[in-house]
Regions:
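Short, Lys/Arg-enriched anionic-surface-contact patches
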Residues: 2-20, 142
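Short alpha-helical "recognition helix" segments of helix-turn-helix
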Residues: 35-40
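Major-groove recognition helix of helix-turn-helix-like DNA-binding domains
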Residues: 45-60
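The −1 position to Zn-ligating cysteines in a subset of zinc-ribbon hairpins
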Residues: 46, 162, 175, 198
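Short Lys/Arg-enriched helix C-cap and helix-to-coil transition segments
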Residues: 62-82
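Short, charged surface segments at domain edges that flank catalytic/cofactor-binding sites
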Residues: 123-162, 180-193
Length: 270
């Protein structure tokens, strides 16, 4: 495909770029990144153009601003509008952006476009799909899968592909954990404020109310978990982190205080 020069960005191209922004660290938003080069080629744009668009989105990210990172100034009105729309309607635009990226890069419907390497595109077999519930019907299965793929990669990437409690950085051992349960709150399923990057062990403990986070984002252990002490392996996985604040995400959104309050009051088994 010929590379566009001075050609206006389409809405679909902006959505693909915003999807990439959600998954790539700020330090990887440059024209030399192989992911940016390949996506730009498939889109018919230059790597410089795509990298600039990603940096424009970075200028709109409040978490980056809080870290003292400004991104590029002068984001287009269309970029600002899409950013606001994406935040307000992520349950629709998250899966849509993932499907657009998939159609651009993948060959099979059941492949996942994995960008967690941050410099290499990998096509992986899709993971286990959580069955649709409530108003979601079987015909929406692909959209649900794309949404889960988007949520997992964006949450893991926002936390630096590390468990926010333990610091474990093995992607296969990490989960994009939901603060408010996935099945009960469809409107918050893909909200980054409802996500934590946790190891599989800490995800299971959090999901079952054996650990929670206090108002200062410090780890709290339940009496039910402590009832299984002493066990060296168990204690070593939890006790060192008790009272320690979690690692915060590097972009997109910090955990919602309201969602965490719900977890403490409804799910946590003190």
């Amino acid at each position: 495909m010929a590379r566009a020069t001075g050609v206006a960005w389409t809405r679909d191209q902006r959505l693909i770029a915003l999807n990439l922004y959600c998954k790539l660290p700020f330090g990887k938003l440059h024209k030399g990144n192989p992911i940016i080069k390949e996506v730009a080629l498939k889109m018919g744009r230059t790597p410089s153009s795509l990298a600039l668009k990603l940096c424009n989105f970075a200028s709109l990210d409040p978490v980056l601003h809080a870290r003292g990172i400004a991104g590029m100034s002068g984001a287009a009105r269309e970029d600002r509008s899409l950013w606001d729309e994406f935040k307000a309607n992520i349950s629709v635009l998250g899966p849509q952006s993932e499907e657009l990226l998939h159609n651009l890069l993948a060959f099979k419907a059941d492949e996942e476009v994995d960008l967690l390497d941050h410099e290499k595109i990998q096509l992986q077999p899709s993971g286990t799909l959580i069955p649709p519930t409530g108003p979601t019907v079987a015909t929406a299965t692909v959209r649900v899968r794309r949404g889960q793929q988007f949520f997992r990669q964006s949450i893991l990437s926002a936390y630096g592909v590390r468990c926010c409690i333990s610091g474990i950085n093995v992607p296969r051992l990490l989960v994009a954990s939901h603060i408010k349960p996935w099945g009960e709150f469809p409107n918050e399923r893909l909200d980054p404020r409802n996500g934590l990057c946790l190891s599989t062990l800490h995800d299971a403990a959090f999901d079952n109310g054996l650990v929670t986070l206090d108002e200062k984002l410090k780890v709290v252990l339940s009496k039910r978990l402590r009832a299984y002490f002493p066990q060296t392996a168990l204690e070593s996985s939890f006790v060192p982190y008790e009272g320690v604040a979690i690692r915060l995400p590097e972009r997109l959104a910090e955990p919602s205080p309201d969602f965490l309050r719900y977890h403490r009051e409804v799910i946590f088994k003190s």
